[in-house]
Amino acid sequence: LPAKSIREAMRIYAAAPSATILWGMGVTQWGQGVDVVKGLSGLALSTGNLGRPNVGVGPVRGQNNVQGACDMGALPNMYPGYQSVTDPATLEKFAKAWGVPSLSGKVGYSLTDVPHKVKEGKIKANYVMGEDPLQTEPDLSMMREAFSELELLIVQDIFMTKTAAEADVIFPATSWGEHEGVYSAADRGFQRFEKAVEPQGDVKPDWEIISLMATALGYPMKYNNTKEIWDELRELCPLYYGATYEKMAGLGYIPWPCTTEDSPGTPWLYAGNKFDRPGGKGLLFASEWRAPMELVDEQYPLVLCTVREVGHYSCRSMTGNCSALQTLADE
């Protein structure tokens, strides 16, 4: 792509009265994804396309509620509400609420760290929930070899995935429509959803499985429903405090931050160009150019490009058992 074309595109973007940058997984799922996302965010910051209506940046995820998983602390360096695991005040607050003497301030491992840490003997067990890493992760040969060396693999899912087929223990979970809860949209909006049908067979909601597991291990969790869990979350997370179950039912949609019960939420962040940093200014990142890791060479002379299938969703983990869809996109 000529440099002239890139500059022309940037000038068009900068001159637009309002502009939004959305990116898919092609931007993020390669060796320089972090640098690219920082660059796109920097473009928005330097052109005034943050902090007002109809502008911004954001990823288009491969699944619903990826934002929700991050909001709830399913990250190696964050507790719920984006509170750092290395912050002493955060550790003290959560430890007191959860009735334990202390909590670890150590940053955990990312998903791509897992096979390497298994090889190093630092991970001996893996508890996989709603994920199919033996079907979807990069360098599957390494991932499968690492999983074969685990002393224990637990999978909690709604289908018998490739990963579940290798598990030592399987916990069958309810699927969408069989339980209630809250989703987060990509624009930080909380959306409450209701159970539509009773689950069939010996399956349980994710939260109940976790509660039973914790209780069996000596840490009793006595939640009766998702509202009790949500209210505990609100008390511990200032960003979410005002997003009550009752208000979500009435408004249908509450974007965080929502810090008080009379607030409708925050439709856009950084109003007035005030950022959550010392001095209130945004931070621009500079990334040095480096050649992509995914270039062909003598050892790997071919590039495999995968595409989306019309008849299946994503990696077939959820749709591969449907015979009608298999006829549309069979190998």
Feature-to-residue mapping (PLM):
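Acidic/polar loop patches that form or flank catalytic/metal-binding clefts of enzymes
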Residues: 20-21, 49-59, 155-156, 172, ...
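Acidic catalytic cores of enzymes that act on phosphate-bearing nucleotides/polynucleotides
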Residues: 17-119
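Predominant activation on well-ordered alpha-helical scaffold segments within soluble catalytic domains
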Residues: 7, 37-44, 112-115, 144, ...
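A cross-kingdom feature strongest in bacterial/archaeal respiratory oxidoreductases
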Residues: 46, 79-80, 88-202, 231-331
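Long, well-ordered, tryptophan-enriched scaffold segments
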Residues: 1-16
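Conserved thiamine diphosphate
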Residues: 1, 196-198, 216
